[in-house]
Amino acid sequence: MIHQYRNNGYNIVMDVYSGSVHVVDDVCYDVIAEVNKSETEPTAESLKEADVKEKLLQTLGNKYETSDIEDALSDAIELTEGGQLFVKDTYECMIEEVKKRKTVVKALCLHIAHDCNLACKYCFAEEGEYHGRRALMSYEVGKKALDFLIKNSGNRRNLEVDFFGGEPLMNWQVVKDLVAYGREQEKIHNKHFRFTITTNGVLLNDEIQEFVNKEMDNVVLSLDGRKEINDQMRPFRNGKGSYDLIVPKFQKLAESRNQEKYYIRGTFTRNNLDFSNDIMHFADLGFKQMSIEPVVGDESDPYAIREEDIPKIMEEYDKLAKMMIEREKEGKGFNFFHFMIDLNGGPCVAKRLSGCGSGTEYLAVTPWGDLYPCHQFVGQDDFLMGNVDDGIVKPEIADDFRSCNVYSKDKCRNCFAKFYCSGGCMANSYNFHGTIHDTYEIGCEMQRKRVECAIMMKAALADEE
């Protein structure tokens, strides 16, 4: 499968199944496009047939010199022979093996607090309550959750635990106690816990910062961008904005972590479709690690992104990519999560095919110990998998998630970005279509654009080296 596109003056050709990316001149771009119109997948041998050259000369001869067309065809043949162009699908045959693979639990999202001190207007957790009641996780439930993770992690040594909410700092003592318990259990069971925390920063102080820097491998700091944008969507319950309180704390924390192992994480809505300005605002505040996610909501929500917003969003990603290139050239570069693509390595085959591991390798735990496939399914009875006392009592839910992959979704099968997004978010699929075996179309369009921008940036920055 070939995907071709032009962006910021670059002609880019992606070979989906080999993962190869080529930056080519106009004639090579057009030659590849023409031979790719064949009803059958081109091979090195078929490209050498005389009629291929003849058709190219007929089609492109009025645009390019004959010698240039011949050279471009020769390059295409060489790339095809080298397994970098027109590579056949070698992944679909692995699906059954991936579906049958034995999985272990590697990560837990601990809902340490089903309560929050903000009232964000787009919050899927309903101010932290998750379709239920306000509650704080007890130390006893948290211990059982860590014990469950150790017991169900098999031979895997490195385990991940994210303290989530609501707002985790509203239950700070239990967070500290559970980290201490985890460190004790590491020695007993030859495990290593990688703790992370997601916070709105309202309760952040020097004592918490010191502990976080000592014990947390990563910190997610919630902020939506410019003051007027953040305060519109992330107010306190009395309507007052949160920006002025939290930004200085976040700046201090980021500096104390040497601008590493954290993310400023925002959400953009219909209210700020010019979200590239929010990313640049983060950069101007001194942050180096950032992400801004599209809100996901019902179309009836006034802030929800709709299909008619997509052209503007595409423009913003292009604009952001160009601004990031300029900042990098000026020595003021920063990382944007959605443009971070590893073209040399990347995730294993199972991850490329089936995604984040929700429901199988990654689970969410409520304050009272119930287990769900991920934080976005919490509170939905159909996805209650078990609890920390009894373990998984509905393995059929895990089986359903395990069977979900880019080949089980019709919309993914012929998508060039399928190995970069691994089929997208299953919670979004369920919320929009009532099944995890579908995709959220607006999210797909944005993902494809982000992949294109990320690869273009690599080409542009390679030119500077």
Predicted segments, located by residue:
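Acidic, low-complexity/disordered tracts enriched in E/D and polar residues
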Residues: M1-S38
